Amino acid sequence: MPENLAKAICNPLFPALDSMLRAGRHISSEDLDNHALLSDYEVELSAFYQRYNTELVKAPEGFFYLRPRSTSLIARSVLSELDMLVGKVLCFLYLSPERLAHEGIFTNQELYEELIALTDEKKLMKLVTNRASGSDLDREKLFEKVRTSLRRLRRLGMIINVGDSGKFSISEAVFRFGADVRAGDDIREAQLRLIRDGEAVVHTQEPTQASLLADEEEQDYNEQAELEGEA
């Protein structure tokens, strides 16, 4: 075993970090120690995960995650349509002036209100049930589903809880949901179009947003399976 790889694996941080990566977590610069470990041993750990037919990716924004291939020995996970939509809105908020005004902190209610404002409410209600009529009960169910999506995205490292009052900050890892932007385009406007049009997101060197961890060539974009092992 190469000396530097041995150093990385023997680091006391590595077992927990490895478990988080395998569970689909994104490691951003806010996670100082784990991010530093991945940065210091990126080459060695990339070779390590290749043995599992999995790629250790460092995104242009600086965060790390694992991308399993179709033959990977590491399980793949899929996000629901609502999870992806919430992720796109989080990315929009990350780019917004409101993030600076709020010192980077948002509430579950603010995210929900932004989601309602930016998308077709009828389409959102169909994510609750096809028979949804837009009643107060339907809206309450939708809010609970949005909270569930936020919990999933928190486990993936997209948001960071602030206290116990339903507040959170947004990680740069939400750029996994970012729109492709042509030179000269406004990135926030591009993200807004993406949300309103309900488009799939495909980056030149990134996987499709239909699956944060799936092989892009085999992913079914209509699959609505929830993340394995999460309530």
UniProtKB/Swiss-Prot annotation:
Residues 214-231 have a biased composition (Acidic residues). Keywords: Cell cycle, Cell division, Chromosome partition, Cytoplasm, DNA condensation. It is found in: Cytoplasm, Nucleoid. One of its GO terms (cellular component) is nucleoid. One of its GO terms (biological process) is chromosome condensation. Residues 211-231 are annotated as: Disordered. HAMAP family: MukE. Belongs to the MukE family. Interacts, and probably forms a ternary complex, with MukF and MukB. The complex formation is stimulated by calcium or magnesium. This is Chromosome partition protein MukE. It comes from Vibrio vulnificus (strain YJ016). The gene is mukE.
